[in-house]
Amino acid sequence: MYNFDYSKLPIKNIQKIFPIAGGYVNLSFSVDASNKKYFLKLQPNTKSNFFDYELSSLKELTDKNIPVPQIINKGELDNNSFLLLEFIENGHAYPESYRKLGKIVANMHKNINSLNLFGFSHNFNGGTIEF
């Protein structure tokens, strides 16, 4: 496991930290605190702006009433960028939920951005900015 001083995170009373598998760009963790659970994304050796595009995407989804984790904090500690989110437990999805999400995402992709192009005004793919 990557060594990181978790005591510097803006969370009080951290009790347990568990790695979560599945990501290919970031290290991910479940963080249990006294009365709350968090999802921590950590990117070693990067500046605090590493997660800026992800944050703008989450805000865009929130504006479209798509439930996403609440953004708690982001920053840089010990030369590592982090993104701290609300932890959402696994749930059950139903066919109607998939249909609704598909329609919302399709409508989002129809919109033209400030550059008079489809999609977001910035092109970001898994840790690198593409031009």
UniProtKB/Swiss-Prot annotation:
<dbReference type="InterPro" id="IPR016477">
    <property type="entry name" value="Fructo-/Ketosamine-3-kinase"/>
</dbReference>
<protein>
    <recommendedName>
        <fullName>Uncharacterized protein in ileS 3'region</fullName>
    </recommendedName>
</protein>
<dbReference type="Pfam" id="PF03881">
    <property type="entry name" value="Fructosamin_kin"/>
</dbReference>
<dbReference type="InterPro" id="IPR011009">
    <property type="entry name" value="Kinase-like_dom_sf"/>
</dbReference>
<keyword id="KW-0614">Plasmid</keyword>
